[in-house]
Amino acid sequence: MKKILLIAVCVMALVSCSNVQVMGFDKVDASEVIVTETYKLEAFEKIDVKGLANVKIIQSEEKNGVVELKAPDNYIELFKFDSKDGRLVIDLAKKVNLDAKNVLITVYTTDLIGLYNSGVSHVKMDSLDTDKMEVINSGVGDIEIGGVADDVKLVCSGVGCIRAKEMKALNVEANVSGVGSVTCYASEKIDGTVSGVGSLKYAGNPKVKNTRRTGIGGISEL
């Protein structure tokens, strides 16, 4: 058990680094010239992050479907944005290693019901007003989200975390099966499962508490 915990701690330490390198990919050094490119895409209500970047999401009617990329000028062509069938996919156009500390992708959308990270990214949304929301983190990185919602589903199966304590939800379904953690807020009902090495922490003093734990992870109330 001690060995498993040590592995988990080491992996989480690697996740905290802003410059994750993938073996076999060429390294592209960042230039010192920072530029901003703006893209107008089809409207979307789901966002899928697959690349390596810092992503900020803003709920906005005026700039709905707009994506802004601020990065070193030689990094601009390395990113691609595709919006189709209500889903925005953020990915790298080439298989390269880059330094993401000076890369910021700002996404504007009227509504958001799904947020997915399968890359190596930090994704943040401070204030979201929606009826339902699904957040899945299966990559290496973290998702931070706040706002209000009726029903929220949180799934962490990768190496990272979902921080949703500031997402004031009525009902939360949370599942942790990887090496990571989920923090959340539920005022009516929490349905939580931990089957990995990670942890689930919840606030809001929900009226109904259904929690299940297998493995060496933990579940606790904040």
Model-derived segments and their meaning:
Residues M1-S157, C161-L222:
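Intrinsically disordered, low-complexity terminal regions
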